[in-house]
UniProtKB/Swiss-Prot annotation:
It is a multi-pass membrane protein. Coiled coil: none annotated. This is Probable cobalamin biosynthesis protein CobD. Pathway: Cofactor biosynthesis; adenosylcobalamin biosynthesis. The keyword Transmembrane applies. It is found in: Cell membrane. NCBIfam families: cobal_cbiB (TIGR00380). Belongs to the CobD/CbiB family. GO terms for molecular function: ABC-type vitamin B12 transporter activity; threonine-phosphate decarboxylase activity. It comes from Thermococcus kodakarensis (strain ATCC BAA-918 / JCM 12380 / KOD1) (Pyrococcus kodakaraensis (strain KOD1)). PANTHER family: COBALAMIN BIOSYNTHESIS PROTEIN CBIB. Keywords: Cell membrane, Cobalamin biosynthesis, Membrane, Transmembrane, Transmembrane helix. The gene is cobD.
């Protein structure tokens, strides 16, 4: 089974139908497995908590791997459908656009509600400019997490790479917090997610270069606050020319972000996505990438 066919099917699925129903979404399954174990494990000590978190991650990753090889054993043409379905579940192009688009409103309370759906910070204490910033930051970060990274691992390792990456990213989203409950239980998931995103986050920055020129590397040098997630944010800030800030954590310089800048950010998002999709198609079609078949 040539990998290009399931990719094109998955891409068409994403752009037309969007996300599968929650009950049938592999990402939801990953989250439910992790949540089930998390809710039943009583915290004991740093070593035991870390070990339990590691085992939780291994359970979810093993499930993701087993799920990803199902198409290998399915008859034609069901194998193509299953491969496309699982691959589509690993990335989210249309859904990310829709979530960020909802933050474009002059109603401050509606904007707070929309932004709260895509960031973990307390939106009730944010003014309009910081709400706009948070929306753009989320778009930039998730361009890597939800588009570039899963397809990067698809190119390297096929369907298994994309699905396992999404499982790890889901684990980090659920368990990768630095608080009393997850400091040790979620540490393995958080560090594994950092490792897997190291190259894709920087690849995402490169995809901004045709749009931002020399400003992109200038802003990239300012991104010293986090291992990965601030790199795409810096690139987006450079291209837009607006400041992006999480108070007390990081700030990239520029003019105050407005509603119009979220619209501009979405246009930039689609340009970067289009460029990345073209790269993926060319690598799959020409045989340059290491993984040509599922």
């Amino acid at each position: 089974m040539h990998a290009l066919v399931p990719f094109l099917l998955a891409l068409a699925w994403d752009l037309t139908l969007g996300e599968p129903p929650a009950k049938l979404h592999p990402v939801v399954w990953f989250g439910r497995i992790a949540g089930f174990i998390d809710s039943r494990y009583k915290r004991r000590s740093p070593v035991l908590d870390f070990t339990a978190g590691l085992l939780t991650a291994l359970v979810v990753i093993t499930f993701a791997f087993l799920l990803s090889i199902v198409p290998f054993y399915a008859p034609f043409p069901l194998n193509y459908f299953l491969a496309a379905y699982l691959l589509k579940s690993s990335f989210a192009i249309k859904s990310l656009h829709e979530h960020v688009s909802r933050t474009i409103t002059d109603d401050i309370e509606e904007k707070r509600r929309a932004v709260s759906m895509i960031v973990s910070r307390n939106t009730k204490v944010l003014d309009e400019a910081h709400l706009n910033s948070a929306a753009i930051e989320s778009l930039a970060e998730n361009l890597n997490d939800s588009v570039v990274a899963p397809l990067f691992y698809f190119l390297l390792f096929g369907l298994q790479g994309a699905v396992i990456y999404r499982a790890v990213n889901t684990l980090d989203a659920m368990l990768g917090y630095r608080n009393e409950r997850y400091e040790f239980f979620g540490k393995f998931s958080a560090r594994l997610d950092d490792a897997l995103n190291f190259i894709p986050a920087r690849l995402t920055v490169l995809l901004y270069l045709p749009l931002g020129g020399r400003k992109v590397p200038e802003y990239y040098r300012l991104a010293r606050f986090k291992i990965n997630s601030d790199k795409p944010m810096a690139a987006m800030s450079a291209v837009l020319g607006v400041w992006l800030e999480k108070p007390g954590v990081y700030r990239f310089p520029g003019k105050e972000p407005k509603n119009e800048d979220i619209k501009r950010a979405l246009r930039i998002y689609w340009l970067v996505v289009t460029g990345w999709v073209i790269v993926v198609v060319l690598l799959l079609a020409t045989g340059v990438c290491p993984c040509l078949s599922l």
